[in-house]
A protein has these predicted regions:
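An amphipathic, aromatic/His-enriched active-site/gating alpha helix that lines ligand/cofactor pockets
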Residues: 24-36, 56-90
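Short, well-ordered beta-strand segments in beta-rich or mixed alpha/beta enzyme
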Residues: 2-9, 39-68, 93
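Intrinsically disordered, low-complexity segments enriched in polar/charged residues with Gly/Pro
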Residues: 15-16, 27-30, 41-44, 77
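Short, surface-exposed ligand-recognition loops at beta-strand->loop->(often short) alpha-helix junctions
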Residues: 9-22
Length: 94
């Protein structure tokens, strides 16, 4: 199993709307992807515009090729992308 960790910074004052958007995007879009196994979102206390998203995949390729290279990625970014203050920083772990 592969763990994707994405550090996300959103525009100030958008937390409530982003909370709804990320939940909707994960449950309606990302969860449809091949190899998707689950997710967890952590919100910053000292930095309320900072989120850490954990997504579990069967393989690295399920995320980097299947999801990111397919139509679901565009749907996901259409939902959450407008909130980003900067591009997310994404890394993978075993």
């Amino acid at each position: 199993m592969i763990l994707e960790i994405a550090e996300i910074r959103i525009a100030p004052g958008q937390q409530a709307a982003f909370d709804e958007a990320i939940q909707r995007g994960l449950t309606t879009v990302v969860s449809q992807a091949k190899g998707f196994r689950g997710w967890k979102v952590n919100k910053g206390i000292e930095s309320p515009e900072r989120y850490v998203l954990h997504i579990f995949w069967d393989t690295l390729e399920d995320h980097t090729v299947g999801f990111r290279g397919g139509p679901l990625f565009a749907q996901w970014r259409a939902i959450v992308g407008p909130f980003f203050a900067a591009p997310p920083v994404v890394e993978h772990f075993t």
